[in-house]
Each structure stands twice: as C-alpha cells, then as structure tokens.
A protein has these predicted regions:
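N-terminal single-pass transmembrane signal-anchor helix
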Residues: 1-32
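Alpha/beta-hydrolase active-site loop signature
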Residues: 4, 35, 194
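Juxtamembrane interface helices immediately C-terminal to a transmembrane segment
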Residues: 23, 32-43
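Short, well-structured segments within or immediately adjacent to enzyme catalytic domains
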Residues: 38-210
Length: 210
C-alpha cells in the first residue's frame, strides 16, 4: 500500500506549482500580446488590400470617408456610421461601408486589443479623401490606416485628422506601439513619438514622427 502524501508534502507541491505559474504568466501574457499584434497586422493587410481593390475598380480613387460631423447618416464612406449623435463606438455599421464587399468580414475592422467596444478600431488618413493613389508622392512613408483611439479625449469616426475636435489620437495598443498600414501596401508596427503630432498627412510630407 502506497504511503499517502503528508500535508507538508502537499503544501510543497502546491508552492512549486504556484512559483511555476508566477514565472509563466508574464511569458504567456507577452505571447498573447504578440498574437493580438499579429492579428491586427493581418486585419490591416486585408483592409489595405480592400482599399487597393476599390481603387482598381474606381479609376485609382481612394475610398471616401465621412466628415465626422453629427446630425446625419453618413453613407458612402469606407465605413458607415449614423451621425445621431456624433460618431460613437456603437453607431458604426461596417456592412454598409463601401469596402465591405471586398472584406466580407466584420472582424477585420476590430483589433483584438481594442477593449472599448467600438465596431471599428482603425481610422483612414484624412488626406485620402477625394484623392488618387497615383497622387501619393511617397507611398512607402504615407500611412493609409492607423489605430485610432476612442476615449473622452478623442473620437474614432473612421478617419484620422488631429486638427479636429474632439482630437484624433493614435492609440498604442501593442507593446507601447501601434500598427500602421501604408499606401504601398506594407503594414508595420511603429512607435509614435507624440500623440499630438499632426497626423493629417501631406502626400509630399509623409509622417515621420515614429
């Protein structure tokens, strides 16, 4: 007959398990953060491709965005929102946006690290409105989409322009950085140096404050 474990032995085993768990938790959390970052990169790759496909089908024009003002239902943007009231995290309907036929997925609009409850985690460069892909002087350095915040200080309305009230701020959801897609199609993680830097890109002067 096997001798049963003593209370001390059981406590030692429990203590060892607790120590191992404490050692593993940071690594597991970091792995989860990395997985969320990778998922966000994939989202923006799919959205960026949708922008390109739309341009191919519409004589090189970028998809439009809506102007962020309240008091109207905004049709025809890359995402759709109901402006009653001014855009909030709950009144987007991505299935009515002009890019949804290309994405065919609600999930690509949402970063897994975005815990605000918003239906859209990204904002489009405001200078793409009424512009063509061929007008971009430096596609590699000109952001197309970025992660936009949605807090009491800022609003996420599907386009990004810091010269707007409330302010548009980039949000760092991934290891003190953020994921950006660029007009040449590449997507990368970058660290933004100042949340109040001008984010309305001039096509001849791409954002460099990373």
């Amino acid at each position: 007959m096997k001798k049963p474990f003593t209370l001390i032995e059981l406590l030692v085993v429990i203590g060892i398990i607790g120590i191992l768990a404490a050692m593993l938790m940071p690594a597991l959390a970091k792995a989860r953060e990395k997985a969320d970052q990778t998922d966000c990169i994939n989202n923006q790759k799919q959205l960026g491709m949708a922008f390109v496909l739309y341009g191919n089908d519409h004589k090189d024009w970028f998809p439009s965005y809506t102007d962020g003002s309240g008091g109207a239902k905004k049709e025809g943007g890359w995402v759709y929102y109901d402006g009653f009231p001014c855009p909030t995290k709950g009144n987007f309907d991505v299935t009515r946006g002009i890019l949804y036929p290309y994405t065919k997925s609600r999930q690509v609009y949402i970063c897994r690290s975005d815990h605000t409850g918003s239906k859209v985690s990204y904002g489009a460069n405001s200078d793409t409105k009424d512009s063509k892909f061929s007008q971009v002087d430096n596609p590699t350095g000109t952001p197309l989409l970025l992660e936009e915040g949605s807090t009491k200080e800022t609003t996420n309305d599907g386009f990004f322009n810091i010269d707007y009230t409330p302010k548009d701020y980039i949000v760092n959801r991934h290891q003190k950085g953020s994921v950006y897609s660029f007009c040449d199609g590449h997507v990368s993680w970058e660290r933004w140096s100042d949340k109040e830097v001008w984010a309305k890109c001039d096509f001849a002067e791409p954002i460099t404050n990373f």
